[in-house]
Amino acid sequence: MWQRIQTLYLGLAAAIVFAMFFCTFATIIGPDGTKITIVYSEKIAYLSLMIMMFIAQVAAAASFKAFFLQARVAVIAGLLAIGFQIWLGIDILRNLDGMSFNVTALFPLVAAALDFMAAQRSMVDEMTLQAVKSTRKGRRKRQK
């Protein structure tokens, strides 16, 4: 399962999404100097999207024997990650004043890039497999 590079990409993307469950999204510094941290899992919308992204990552990594299915699920996971990144970007632009945002806000973008690279590698593997099957089939017909 872990011999193919696309499975490693998907595993790394799943680890990035899993890490977001425990990371802070932003810090609010009050007028009296108190710090309030906001974790991704505090917002229900963020939590539900992160759960969906993590399930899609694991499902894509688990479907390593079906290359087309793996590529499709990886693309879906990447689109979910891009949607989540857009949502985070809108929230950041809305609350730019008074909040300090963490670098983990870019994790969905990294996960999406890994998902799309995994989908591309999965399709390359499937095309290579189809070409080898086609070549072998042609040789067998000529030998008869």
Where do the model's predicted regions map?
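Cytosolic juxtamembrane helix and N-cap/initiation of the first transmembrane helix
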Residues: 1-20
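Hydrophobic transmembrane helix segments
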Residues: 15-43
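Interfacial helix-start motif at the membrane-water boundary
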Residues: 37-55
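Juxtamembrane helix-break-helix junctions at the cytosolic face
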Residues: 57-71
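Hydrophobic alpha-helical membrane segments
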Residues: 72-89
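Membrane-helix boundary connector in multi-pass membrane proteins
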Residues: 89-102
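Alpha-helical membrane-associated segments of multi-pass integral membrane proteins
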Residues: 99-124
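Cytosolic juxtamembrane helix at the C-terminal end of the final transmembrane segment
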Residues: 118-140
